[in-house]
Amino acid sequence: MVKKGAKVILIDRVDNRLTASRGNFGLVWVQGKGKGMPRYVEWCIEATERWPEFAENLENETGFNLNYEKTGGLEICLGEEEHQERINFIEEMSQASNSGRYDCEMISKKKLQSMLPKIKLGKEVSGASFCSQDGCVTPLNLLKAMNSSFQQKGGTYRPEQTVQKIEFSSNEFKIETGTHNFKTEKLVIAGGLMTTKLAKMVGMEVPVIPERGQILVTERTSRVFNYPTAEIRQNYDGSFMLGSSHEAGDYDTDTSYEVLQKIAKRAIRILPNLKNLQLIRSWGALRVLTPDQKPVYLESDQCPGAYAITSHSGVSLASIHSSILVEWILEERIPPGFTAFHPKRFNVQEAI
């Protein structure tokens, strides 16, 4: 928005927990996103198509290396049952792509091993799905670069501000944080797990829930695994990240031995040589999920000029959020098929 000449203040609260923007896996992903919502499939595809230019521009502006790689991504299967389930999933996703641009295929174990010549696959590996549109990025560098670009172009960053109250009167919003007051004619709520509470203050119902994911990180080693997966990826520095756990419920970001053990065991079943690496770090972070795990984009009917945005795919969709959503908010240019992302889909009576 600052690139379009808007005067923007970013209010960020105090949060000592590891949030999704800092604790994520860094995937720029298509193949597993959008089941049951064709518009979301196309949204993710368009976002990945915009990512190379988005990354290049951000690196040139800020000097941060995002380490963005669009190598394609894998989902590796263990056993025939997982393999068949994946076949069914990919077929359903392919049929859901209205444009026919969803590019994902199943590959055999032999083909998979030929793609990974420097590391041996486990005996139970039965094949994988491969999506040429997938890739990965260093998430902390992305966050730093976006914050840097925002401030370089005139944006004002106000950290350690917890919004306590939002009022709307005479086409103007007043935001109170306890230490400061802010006024604006347009308000964008992108508050992660606080979105539900904040959106209610301006007449919007946006349900979000936390889901904990835990991650293990190994020591650095030579690059041998060139394709990211949702469970295993090798970072630019050579360390491996292992993850993909899902625990719904509370706001606890602690790790648990049982879950970390399960993550490690599955990773070793896929890549047995990982057992030779030392584990050096682990963490838990909270995903921000709507009931169907799809995005919500909404303008308030009660308080025009207030918008709510929430998505589990913040990294994957960063390229499209910084372009098309800006046009929606500043220029009222509503993207085609945007009603699919309205939260009325969670209310059966309203959706009919």
Residues covered by each model-derived region:
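Central helical "cap/lid" subdomain
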Residues: 18, 177-225
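Helix-loop-beta segment of a Rossmann-like dinucleotide-binding subdomain
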Residues: 64-77, 100-153, 245-249, 304-311
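C-terminal catalytic lobe of FAD-dependent flavoproteins
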Residues: 271-352
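Dinucleotide-binding Rossmann-like beta1-alpha1 core, especially the glycine-rich loop
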Residues: 27-115, 266-271
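Mid-domain catalytic core of redox enzymes
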Residues: 218-258
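Glycine-rich FAD pyrophosphate-binding loop
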Residues: 2-24
